[in-house]
């Protein structure tokens, strides 16, 4: 039976292993309906930074804060791996291509938000991602039933947007009420170090 998980967090379980994209992934679900789901992986930083994006798109950035220039891009998923989007808190600014989500979050795929960021006009929280993850109708429901994913509606923006990527999966698990030991018991295997 279909269940809407929009604006919830998916946490890959130890059953997803040896998958370069989804092993120990934390996914924020932007859309979820009877036709399928779309989400962004938020804990897999890439080597590319916002500075690389500004240079590629010829966005002036001489006055951009250094920490912004060094901000990593995140692999949002395997679909459209060259499309950049910004997951961010709403800040009262209207951008050309913004989809408002729940919990005061939005996703923007237009250049105007990148220009704002280059000018140090920043949302409270933001995460630049390239690509996205997608599930067809019933695919995500089936994967959840197969215990590939833990779903949590315990959204914490500080955890969602922090840069402690090596422990973000574990932090979300703990925020959802799980421990590595409870996963070991649940899945009767060693989950390994995060």
Curated annotation (Swiss-Prot):
InterPro entries: AlgH-like. Gene3D superfamilies: VC0467-like, VC0467-like domains. Signal peptide: none annotated. GO terms for cellular component: cytosol. It holds the Pfam family DUF179. Transmembrane segments: none annotated. Belongs to the UPF0301 (AlgH) family. This is UPF0301 protein FTL_1216. It comes from Francisella tularensis subsp. holarctica (strain LVS).
């Amino acid at each position: 039976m279909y269940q809407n998980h929009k604006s919830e967090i998916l946490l890959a379980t130890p059953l997803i292993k040896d998958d370069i994209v989804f092993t120990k992934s934390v996914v924020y679900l932007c859309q979820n309906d009877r036709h399928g789901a779309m989400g962004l992986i938020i804990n897999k930083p890439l080597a590319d930074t916002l500075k690389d994006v500004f240079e590629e798109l010829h966005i002036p950035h001489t006055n951009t804060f250094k920490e912004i220039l060094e901000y990593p891009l995140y692999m949002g998923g395997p679909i459209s791996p060259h499309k950049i989007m910004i997951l961010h808190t709403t800040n009262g600014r209207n951008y050309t291509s913004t989809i408002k989500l729940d919990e005061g979050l939005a996703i923007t795929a237009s250049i105007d938000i990148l220009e704002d960021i280059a000018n140090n006009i920043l949302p409270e929280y933001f995460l630049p991602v390239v690509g996205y993850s997608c599930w067809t109708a019933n695919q995500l429901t089936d994967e959840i039933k197969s215990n590939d994913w833990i779903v949590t509606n315990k959204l914490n923006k500080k955890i969602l947007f922090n840069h402690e990527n090596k422990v973000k999966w574990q932090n979300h698990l703990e925020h959802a009420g799980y421990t590595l030991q409870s996963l070991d018991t649940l899945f009767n295997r060693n989950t390994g170090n995060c």
